[in-house]
Amino acid sequence: MNNSLWSDALYRLSRNRAAMFGGFILILLIICAALAPWIAPYSYSYQNLSLGASPPSADYLLGTDVLGRDLLSRILYGARISLLVGFVATGVALIIGVSWGIIAGYIGGRVDSIMMRIVDILYGLPFIIFIILLMVIFGRNLWLLFGAIGAVEWLTMARIVRGQVIGLKNQEFVMAAKAMGVSNISMFRRHLLPNILGPIAVYATLTIPQVMLLEGFLSFLGLGIQPPMSSWGTLIKDGVESMEEFSWLLIYPGITFTITLFALNFFGDGLRDALDPKT
């Protein structure tokens, strides 16, 4: 995309109030996560066993968990892990999926058939086994976990991008560019990528909360974040287990996650409209 298209997209995005509100919430969450060590009332590992499972109070605004750890502090610290795994894993998925989909869709023929059969095979493999193998081979590592989650989330993006590229490559403007001798790299950059950024943006905003919950599931299996560290996924999992007795342990992490989900959806929809060259 040239500078004019980027400027137009930024202008359209700035005129979308819902997208701006979603973006503001996301920026606020990122700032809170980054400043968690300074703004959190307590450390994420601090325990006051005499006040275990206490409801919200003046000292513990959102209450404590069964081990007497401040829930507000754990939500703030958990935001660092959840947002990081969300953005990093989604970034890995986008890089692999977009590249795979563009190559398969643009080249077509036997190459497309082979590449998409590989995608179909990978869809049938249990991702848990893949992640366990990575952990066994390379050892438990937080960044490896992020990369592993991204490596199993790219398949849908590859299919989406491939379908978009197949629909675009026979359009008149693409055929004209080919006739003028435009290189494949320029074709991708100037004609294909600008027209698929909208669907990519929407899928990315849907993938981020999905990988957040996936991280919580992996932590439950002992493959993800380990105590005393926390993420929103692990907090929600713990809250579900004790929701009948201590409902606040699920309500507040759930509200935080829901607000993040809506903010991502608002911002993603705005990005889709702003990046659509037809608007």
Language-model features: where?
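Gly/Trp-centered helix-boundary motif
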Residues: 1-98, 102-103, 109-110, 124, ...
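Generic hydrophobic transmembrane alpha-helix motif, especially the helices
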Residues: 61, 65, 71, 95, ...
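Short helix-capping/hinge motifs at transmembrane helix termini and TM-loop junctions
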Residues: 36-44, 105-109, 134-140, 152, ...
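Glycine-rich helix-loop "coupling/hinge" segments at transmembrane-helix boundaries
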Residues: 135-137, 149, 164-165, 206, ...
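Residue-level hotspots within pore-lining transmembrane alpha-helices
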Residues: 80, 122, 126, 135, ...
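Short hydrophobic alpha-helical segments within the ABC transporter permease transmembrane module
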Residues: 71-76, 83, 118, 161, ...
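Short alpha-helical transmembrane interface motifs in multi-pass membrane proteins
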Residues: 81-85, 100, 112-116, 143-147, ...
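Transmembrane alpha-helix boundary and packing residues in multipass membrane permease domains
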Residues: 29, 102, 131-136, 145, ...
